[in-house]
UniProtKB/Swiss-Prot annotation:
Coiled coil: none
Catalytic machinery residues: E94, C344
Annotated Radical SAM core domain residues: 100-339
Residues annotated to bind [4Fe-4S] cluster: C114, C118, C121
Protein name: Dual-specificity RNA methyltransferase RlmN
Entry's family note: Belongs to the radical SAM superfamily. RlmN family.
A biological process from GO: rRNA base methylation
Gene3D superfamilies noted in UniProt: 1.10.150.530, Aldolase class I
Organism in which the protein naturally occurs: Vibrio cholerae serotype O1 (strain M66-2)
Sequence positions that bind S-adenosyl-L-methionine: G168, E169, S200, S222, L223, H224, N301
UniProt cross-references to InterPro entries, sorted A to Z: Aldolase_TIM (IPR013785), Methyltransferase_A (IPR040072), RlmN_N (IPR048641), RNA_MTrfase_RlmN (IPR027492), rRNA_lsu_MTrfase_RlmN/Cfr (IPR004383), rSAM (IPR007197)
Protein task: Specifically methylates position 2 of adenine 2503 in 23S rRNA and position 2 of adenine 37 in tRNAs. m2A2503 modification seems to play a crucial role in the proofreading step occurring at the peptidyl transferase center and thus would serve to optimize ribosomal fidelity.
UniProt keyword list: 4Fe-4S, Cytoplasm, Disulfide bond, Iron, Iron-sulfur, Metal-binding, Methyltransferase, rRNA processing, S-adenosyl-L-methionine, Transferase, tRNA processing
Listed GO MF terms: 4 iron, 4 sulfur cluster binding; metal ion binding; rRNA (adenine(2503)-C2-)-methyltransferase activity; rRNA binding; tRNA (adenine(37)-C2)-methyltransferase activity; tRNA binding
Length: 373
């Protein structure tokens, strides 16, 4: 009988120290040495860890492994964006690398599929299967860093920012999200600034409540409508936590956070003749008066079978100018990777069981109203 090996990517620093002490009978500092090899050097071979004694290396080889998702497919956009299908178990999730002049952002998935069924999102139309483990979340960053390689060797910019905006709702996977974020921030992990790690949520209020005082990262909220009636039509989660409840906890989170510099990023996808009218812009501006924020407008990225369209440039421009009359900071997101379906809302992956919507639609014992496909 073969005993399954323990994947060390499933542990943040605290968890790894505990595992080394309690399960391996080793001093905690050894855990930190191994952690540095894993994340600073991208090492997944214990024999290469030359400051670890042979006895411990043999013990690690017998009981442990360093196993990240592997790339099953890679697509390269004309603008430099890369979309990877990362194999997790017997399924794929999608991870996107977005290079810019002064940074390189990695868009990371938190679930296989998504249970929230936002009407404009391609991922949601694929159904939900399961939450990703810590190793499958942080492993996307580990694998991407290895694929990109050193800038001097590949000419590609190393990853400077991580956004939890891939497949899934991050705050419905808190158990695995928090340790993964800790590794991103840890000096022995990827050592990213808390201002360079962003979590995006569609409005899981109870998850955001948990984050207050527990983890400090940049926050982006998927609002996408200026009133409850319209938001409930395109985002069923609004029937569980309405806009007022959502914004109230958002204000408390950013007040407790240093990473957000006192402001939250409000994401607003523009759907042609659905939520992009001048009246919607006025209503949105009034709604956000009490919430320190910057507004990021996202012109809809079409996908096959979608009932929505991208607004004309004139409608997008008019919406932005209306918001700016209220002295809001408003940007329009530049579409990246749309030629490989890697743009916002286009990620699909490979969801084997498209009917499974069980645990992930339960939060604090309350059912989130989502339809079963």
């Amino acid at each position: 009988m073969t005993t399954e090996k323990v994947n060390l990517l499933d542990f943040d620093r605290k968890g790894l120290r505990t595992f080394f002490a309690e399960e391996l009978g080793e001093k905690a500092f050894r855990a930190e040495q191994v952690m540095k090899w894993i994340y600073h050097f991208g090492c997944d071979d214990f024999d290469q860890m030359n400051n670890i004694n042979k006895q411990l290396r043999e013990k690690l080889k017998a009981k442990c492994e360093i196993r990240a998702p592997y790339v099953s497919e890679a697509q390269h956009s004309a603008d430099g964006t890369i979309k990877w299908a990362m194999r997790v178990g017997d399924q794929d999730v999608e991870t996107v690398y977005i290079p810019e002049d002064d940074r390189a952002t990695l868009c990371v998935s938190s679930q296989v599929g998504c249970a929230l069924e936002c009407k404009f999102c391609s991922t949601a139309q694929q159904g939900f299967n399961r939450n990703l483990r810590v190793s499958e979340i942080i492993g996307q960053v580990w694998r991407a860093a290895r694929e990109i390689g050193l800038e001097k060797e590949t000419g590609r910019r190393p990853i400077t920012n991580v956004v939890m905006m891939g497949m899934g709702e991050p705050l419905l996977n808190m158990k695995n999200l928090i340790p993964a974020l800790e590794i991103m921030l840890d000096d022995l992990g990827f050592g990213l600034s808390k201002r360079r790690v962003t979590v995006s949520t569609s409005g899981v209020v109870s998850g955001l409540e948990q984050m207050i005082g527990q983890i400090d990262v940049a926050l982006a909220i998927s609002l996408h409508a200026p009133n409850d009636k319209l938001r409930s039509e395109i985002m069923p989660i609004n029937d569980r936590w309405n806009i007022e409840a959502f914004l109230e906890v958002v204000r408390r989170y950013i007040a407790s956070s240093n990473a957000n510099r006192g402001k939250v990023t409000v994401e607003y996808v523009l759907l042609d003749h659905v939520n992009d009218g001048t009246e919607h812009a006025h209503e949105l501006a009034e709604l956000l008066k009490g919430t320190p924020c910057k507004i990021n407008l996202i012109p809809f990225n079409p996908y096959p079978g979608s009932p929505y369209k991208k607004p004309s440039n004139s409608r997008i421009d008019r919406f932005q100018k209306t918001l700016m009359q209220y002295e809001h900071t408003v940007t329009i997101r530049k579409t990246r990777g749309d030629d490989i379906d890697a743009a916002c809302g286009q990620l699909v992956g490979d969801v084997i069981d498209r009917t499974k919507r069980t645990k992930a639609k339960q939060f604090d014992g309350q059912a989130i109203p989502v339809k079963t496909l």
